[in-house]
């Protein structure tokens, strides 16, 4: 299931009026799904979309973080214990040097019975450099680290599978070779097109156990 569609369904299903923290909220992309909630955003507000760190990394321009409620390190958010009914952290864990420390902080901030909503890439190119530290968040990562912290997994579903991931990555080939000024970039586009069609024909096959875009998780803090 598409990540944004999944997030919309999960967030809009939360009870009206509860207090939710959007950790690593960036440009508040998911706030529109939380109009019925008491929404609080947090971000460290240090990434500005600069281009100076490696031209090959994926950078984002026109970065607007002017509407963040709490500016802090995600592992030390200045809020009392058990002060949120739900916490959202979407596509952020790869930008944290020690992502398990963020899980510790989320556990502290959640009320018993509260929901922790997580998404993170299983495989991603370097982006938002230099704040990109890890990838490869498998379902086993969630199962191990959440259960170890007293968080019970409610749902854990894959976004895409290996075939869909390969289709996405091979479609980048022509653009990357052209960016690198490789004389053979037209051939790279052709090769990428052939590969795209092959993997498109295979996307109905289940292969999320090999790889996928990422896992969608809802965990509950044990009472």
Say what each PLM segment does:
Residues 61, 71, 97-105, 111, ...:
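S-adenosyl-L-methionine-dependent methyltransferase catalytic module, highlighting the catalytic core
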Residues 18-128, 143, 217-221:
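Conserved SAM-binding loop
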Residues 1-18, 27-29:
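Conserved alpha-helix/loop element of class I SAM-dependent methyltransferases that forms part
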Residues 10-22, 165-170:
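Short, charged, low-hydrophobicity "junction" segments
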Residues 2-5, 22-23, 67-69, 199-201:
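Short gly/ser/thr-rich secondary-structure transition/capping motifs
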Residues 6-12, 55-57, 86, 123-124, ...:
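A generic short-segment signal for beta-strand/edge and adjacent turn/coil regions
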Residues 2-6, 24-25, 101, 137:
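Short, conserved clusters of charged catalytic residues that mark active-site
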């Amino acid at each position: 299931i598409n990540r944004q569609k999944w997030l919309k369904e999960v967030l809009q299903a939360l009870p009206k009026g509860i207090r939710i923290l959007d950790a690593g909220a960036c440009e508040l992309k998911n706030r529109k799904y939380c109009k019925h909630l008491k929404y609080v955003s947090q971000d460290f507000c240090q990434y500005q979309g600069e281009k100076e760190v490696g031209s090959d990394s994926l950078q984002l321009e026109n970065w607007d973080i002017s509407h963040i409620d709490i500016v802090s390190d995600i592992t030390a958010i200045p809020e009392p214990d058990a002060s949120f009914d739900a916490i959202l952290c979407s596509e952020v864990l790869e930008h944290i040097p020690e992502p398990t420390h963020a899980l510790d902080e989320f556990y502290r901030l959640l009320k018993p019975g509260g929901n922790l909503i997580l998404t993170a890439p299983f495989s991603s190119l370097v982006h938002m450099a230099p704040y990109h530290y890890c990838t490869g968040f498998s379902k086993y990562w969630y199962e191990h680290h959440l259960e170890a912290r007293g968080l019970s997994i409610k749902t854990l579903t894959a976004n895409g599978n290996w075939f869909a991931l390969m289709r996405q990555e091979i479609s980048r080939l022509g653009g990357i070779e052209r960016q690198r000024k490789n004389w053979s970039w037209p051939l790279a586009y052709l090769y990428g097109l052939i590969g795209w069609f092959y993997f498109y024909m295979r996307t109905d096959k289940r292969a999320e156990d090999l790889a996928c875009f990422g896992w969608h998780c809802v965990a509950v803090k044990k009472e």
